[in-house]
Amino acid sequence: MNVLFAGGGTGGHLYPAVAMAGELQKRVPHVKLSFAGTEAGIEAREIPRLGYRLHLLSVRGLKRGRSLGALVDNLGVLADFIGAVRSALAIINSESPDVVVGTGGFVSAPLLLAAQMRGKKTLIQEQNAFPGVTTKLLSLFASEIHLSFEEAKPYIARKKEVYISGNPSRSFSAIDPDQARLRFGLAESLPTLLVFGGSRGARSINNAVLKWLDQITASANLIWQTGSLDYERIKAGVTSSARIWIGPYIENMGEAYAASELVVCRAGASTIAEVTNTAKPSVLVPYPHATGDHQRHNARALAENGAALLIDDEHLQAPESRQLVLDLLHDRTRRSAMSKAALLLAYPDATAALVDRIIRLAKS
């Protein structure tokens, strides 16, 4: 069996593909796996490190807006795309994959298109509640489309071979909450707030938490991943380390989720998958500049089902937002209801389910 994964740029597009590749290796002896990406994406570093073959394409996204500069730049983008499709056709010819799996990012469009032009089986895995342009267009010709949210269905023109499969994400071993808190050097008996904004951090979330710090630590623990860009600034602004674990990056997120009663975070697809799979009530702060405002759609999908609260980035530092977080942190009954709602939205077997479909397509 030969499977080619096309996706990347960010971890949100890459890691679902990596999870599926790992599952395929476990289940299919001698499976041949390769990836396609761009030199500027996270895949250029991660895929060779993981030992997979990587094909690099030159492709970039369209600039939004109607200015002359945007128009001129987009003509260059179109020329790059045509060149990328030619390169993708060469990759398809040389690799001869049984299935091409697209997980999003600029690179998935030329690879999926080239595969469809060559009559190859294609599977699209869409992570967000608001599908991207590539998914909307190429889903018309894909063998199968797999969505992570029921809310994404209305944006897909076709109705056959469309599945809700969830988003592949990291799996975490069961850990005792008290033991997990001890590993962060925190009191076992206090409710714990987990805050993070990705590996690089989220400045608006960090600024808000810095402002709320005294009120949080008066009656709760705090596990705070600041991100690499903000760590030194935030660390300098924290006058007491009592009841706080603070760091640029959390090595073991399973322990962090186990230790916490409530999570404050962005609403990227991978994060959504993790908070639902771990049944964590959350306060979601969508990144306001995400393409198509897709993080708001993700957050709304949880909020409307009772699994999360949604706070706009611009309102995060308001006193009402701080009080909302503190009240929820100490409201066990409400948190329990949100936890149950989150679990109903979870797809802990997403990776296995998607690999089942890849194997089926390859054999058909």
UniProtKB/Swiss-Prot annotation:
Catalytic activity: di-trans,octa-cis-undecaprenyl diphospho-N-acetyl-alpha-D-muramoyl-L-alanyl-D-glutamyl-meso-2,6-diaminopimeloyl-D-alanyl-D-alanine + UDP-N-acetyl-alpha-D-glucosamine = di-trans,octa-cis-undecaprenyl diphospho-[N-acetyl-alpha-D-glucosaminyl-(1->4)]-N-acetyl-alpha-D-muramoyl-L-alanyl-D-glutamyl-meso-2,6-diaminopimeloyl-D-alanyl-D-alanine + UDP + H(+)
Places the protein is found: Cell inner membrane
Top-level taxonomic group: Bacteria
Record-level GO BP terms: carbohydrate metabolic process; cell division; cell wall organization; lipid glycosylation; peptidoglycan biosynthetic process; regulation of cell shape
Binding positions for UDP-N-acetyl-alpha-D-glucosamine per the UniProt entry: 10-12, 128, 170, 199, 250, 295
InterPro entries assigned: GlcNAc_MurG, Glyco_trans_28_C, GlycoTrans_28_N
Enzyme Commission number, as recorded: 2.4.1.227
Cell membrane is among the record's keywords: yes
GO terms for MF: UDP-N-acetyl-D-glucosamine:N-acetylmuramoyl-L-alanyl-D-glutamyl-meso-2,6-diaminopimelyl-D-alanyl-D-alanine-diphosphoundecaprenol 4-beta-N-acetylglucosaminlytransferase activity; undecaprenyldiphospho-muramoylpentapeptide beta-N-acetylglucosaminyltransferase activity
Keywords: Cell cycle, Cell division, Cell inner membrane, Cell membrane, Cell shape, Cell wall biogenesis/degradation, Glycosyltransferase, Membrane, Peptidoglycan synthesis, Transferase
Chief subcellular location: membrane
Disulfide bonding pattern of the chain: none
Membrane topology: Peripheral membrane protein
Gene3D superfamilies, sorted: Glycogen Phosphorylase B (3.40.50.2000)
Family annotation (PANTHER family): GLYCOSYLTRANSFERASE, UDP-N-ACETYLGLUCOSAMINE--N-ACETYLMURAMYL-(PENTAPEPTIDE) PYROPHOSPHORYL-UNDECAPRENOL N-ACETYLGLUCOSAMINE TRANSFERASE 1
Xref: NCBIfam families: murG
Family assignment from sequence similarity: Belongs to the glycosyltransferase 28 family. MurG subfamily.
Protein name: UDP-N-acetylglucosamine--N-acetylmuramyl-(pentapeptide) pyrophosphoryl-undecaprenol N-acetylglucosamine transferase
Gene: murG
